[in-house]
Amino acid sequence: LNISDNTLDKVREYLVKELNPHTLILFGSSVKGYFREDSDIDVAFISAKEVKSYDLYLLAQALVLEVGREVDLIDFTQASTVFKTQILGLGQVIYSNDPKKLAEFQIRTLKEYALLNEERAEILGNISSRGSIYGR
C-alpha cells in the first residue's frame, strides 16, 4: 500500500495554505515502503512562522478530517539534531518554494550532526571499551 497522490496533494495544499512553509518533508512509513491501512502520515515542515504546539495539534486534527487518517506534524526547527538528520536522510521533500533555504537547513543540520558525533565520540568510546554504560 502506498500513500495516494490525491492524499499527498491534500496534505500539501492544506499545509501550504495554513503554515506557509518553505519546505515540507514526508517521512516515516509512507516513504520507507511499509505504509499500511492504519499508518499515519508523518510530515516535517520548515516555516518562518512560529507555530505553537496546540495550534499544530489543531492543524493535525483538521487534516485527519481532510484525508481520513492520522497526521503527525513535526516542526523541523524544534526537532533534535538526530531526528532532523533522520528526516533529511530518509524523508522525501514534497514541497519547497525556496531550494536555497532548504539547502541551508540541510547543511546546517549535517554540521550539527557531525559536531554532535565529535562531542560524543569519547563518551561512546569509553562505553565501548568498558562494555557498559555505568562502568560495572
Which residues does each PLM region occupy?
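Catalytic core of pol beta-like nucleotidyltransferases
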Residues: 1-23, 31-33, 48-136
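Short hydrophobic/aromatic beta-strand micro-patches
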Residues: 44-46
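Short glycine/proline-enriched turns and hinge-like loops at secondary-structure junctions
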Residues: 36-39
